[in-house]
């Protein structure tokens, strides 16, 4: 009978009077694939740190079975800043690389006529067996493939000059090549584009060890997880199946719990209705939004009462017939062309998902729309009635010494958002900042907290055309669902850069996709429909191979 990799028995974790995990019992076997969900601050990352041995439980037991190895991808992973990207990743091979080096040394020693051939042959045979078992003969090839698939920086790049996203990709690459028996991933899809995420899903499907992933990426959980573990108010609730199955089972649990979770049940019902609907029905619903602008705008005008227990987007000024038109636009920096001969028309009530790898010009497109970057040629026409809401992702104007509430509210108890007076404490709380979190200094916020603050700053501008740059990064599933529902009810337009496929399927009426290649690296494609419909269209236009990740030339088989 197989041994459990890890066990927790009646485990409790607290910090002073604050209980994070309470009376938790769990165990799992090698090969388990588990997705961990729950609101931010409920202890998901703490659970992973306990499994990794970085934290200890206050009471009870938490034990990694002797003989098994464990590795963790943290939200801010530690790397050796004195080494290059390649040197950091090569540390993953450790003992295997040493065995390969020793194997080669033996070959040289056997050229000596005085060598002890029997002893050397015995050592060589043992080393060969161990290297074969670890698939250790092509380490350089594995390294190159994994770095390419995850878009790691050049191997000679010093780690100390890498951005936060680059460091995470380097750390993830190193961890996957280490191939621990228990692989712990905290938001593994952050800072990955759609092609890298697809590669990671395929890699984890073949992974022999146990995988525990904290992630907000619901398609990732649908495609990888065989169990969902929900962390809620100190307790763990296991659900057999993937994320869609979890939604079904949790809905039944909430029915039993009754009205105390009425708002959560309503939000869950909205998502569950979407999951149960056919792809054609989803597409029809998204398309129908384009014809309902007048109705949605009138309803928003007549309903001035807002409930900021969830994210709300008040209606901006009424849109005219023209919102945004791109006519043969071209954008280049010197010889580097990012956008070439792109034309599209954004209709009223349209929500556009902008997709493509990092560095192909998505954020540059936003800067051309708001006038921060000039076009090289072509024309961008913005309607006279359009008011744009946009905050630059660099956020250079924010005072790091102001607390979060002050930065968003300007120190006012009430602010006006699109003609509606809003209590600022409640407004900030709707983005997941409760109580003492509102007093955190802007300069020390985590990446996820800065992202939510950026979203609050953008939406308070009261525009009717929202430009949102990666709003889904580091949001928990509940906040994501709240944002999705707010966008679906918003009478206006949005252009959203995101790699979250579930999010784009639910809200997008159009997709603007980078489809560049060696011949035309600045090619973009405008499509009416959501993400899934776009993917089907892409296969129909370009063939089945278009849906596969192209960075992976040969599968990794180690681990």
What are these regions (language model features)?
Residues 1-262, 308, 312-559:
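ABC ATP-binding cassette signature C-motif
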Residues 249-282, 286-292, 296-303:
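Intracellular alpha-helical coupling/juxtamembrane segments of multi-pass membrane proteins
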């Amino acid at each position: 009978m197989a041994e459990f990799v890890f066990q927790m028995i009646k485990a409790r974790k607290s910090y002073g009077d604050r209980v994070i995990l309470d009376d938790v019992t769990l165990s799992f076997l090698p090969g388990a694939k588990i997705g961990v969900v729950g609101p931010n601050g409920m202890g998901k990352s703490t659970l992973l740190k306990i499994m990794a041995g970085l934290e200890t439980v206050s009471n009870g037991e938490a034990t990694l079975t002797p003989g098994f190895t464990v590795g963790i991808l943290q939200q801010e992973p530690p790397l050796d800043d004195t080494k290059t990207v390649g040197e950091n990743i090569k540390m993953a091979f450790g003992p295997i690389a040493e065995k390969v080096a020793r194997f080669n040394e033996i070959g040289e020693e056997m050229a000596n006529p005085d060598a002890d051939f029997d002893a050397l042959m015995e050592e060589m045979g043992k080393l060969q067996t161990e290297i074969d078992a670890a698939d250790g003969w092509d380490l350089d090839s594995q390294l190159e493939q994994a770095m390419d698939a995850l878009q790691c920086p050049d191997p000679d790049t010093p780690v100390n000059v890498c951005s936060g996203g680059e460091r995470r990709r380097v750390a993830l690459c190193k961890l996957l090549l280490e191939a621990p028996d228990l692989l712990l991933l905290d938001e593994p899809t952050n800072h990955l584009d759609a092609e890298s995420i697809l590669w990671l899903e395929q890699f984890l499907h073949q992974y022999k060890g146990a995988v525990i992933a904290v992630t907000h990426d619901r398609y990732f959980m649908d495609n990888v997880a065989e169990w969902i573990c929900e962390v809620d108010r100190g307790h763990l609730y296991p659900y057999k199946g993937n994320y869609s199955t979890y939604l079904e089972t949790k809905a039944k649990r909430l029915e039993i719990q009754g009205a105390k979770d009425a708002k959560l049940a309503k939000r869950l019902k909205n998502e569950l209705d979407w999951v149960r609907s056919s792809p054609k029905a989803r597409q029809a619903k998204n398309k129908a939004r384009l014809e309902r602008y007048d109705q949605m705008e009138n309803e928003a005008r007549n309903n001035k009462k807002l409930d900021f227990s969830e994210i709300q987007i008040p209606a901006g000024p009424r849109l005219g017939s023209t919102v945004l038109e791109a006519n043969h636009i071209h954008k280049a920096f010197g010889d580097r062309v990012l956008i070439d001969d792109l034309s599209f028309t954004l209709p009223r009530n349209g929500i556009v998902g902008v997709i493509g790898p990092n560095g192909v010009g998505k954020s540059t497109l936003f800067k051309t729309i708001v006038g921060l970057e000039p076009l090289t040629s072509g024309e961008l026409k913005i309607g006279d009635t359009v008011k744009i809401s946009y905050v630059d992702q660099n956020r250079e104007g924010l005072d790091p010494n102001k607390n979060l509430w002050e930065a968003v509210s300007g120190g006012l108890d009430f602010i006006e958002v699109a003609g509606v007076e809003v209590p600022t404490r409640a407004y900030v709380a709707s983005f997941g900042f409760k109580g003492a979190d509102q007093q955190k200094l802007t300069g020390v916020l985590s990446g996820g907290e800065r992202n939510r603050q950026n979203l609050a700053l953008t939406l308070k501008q009261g525009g009717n055309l929202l430009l949102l740059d990666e709003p889904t990064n580091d949001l928990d599933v509940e906040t994501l669902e709240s944002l999705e529902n707010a966008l679906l009810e918003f009478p206006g337009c949005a252009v959203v850069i995101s790699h979250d496929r579930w999010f784009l399927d639910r809200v997008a009426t159009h997709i603007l996709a980078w489809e560049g290649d060696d011949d035309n690296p600045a090619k973009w494609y405008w499509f009416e429909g959501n993400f899934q419909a776009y993917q089907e269209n892409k296969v129909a236009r370009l063939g089945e191979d278009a849906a596969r990740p192209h960075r992976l030339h040969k599968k990794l088989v180690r681990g």
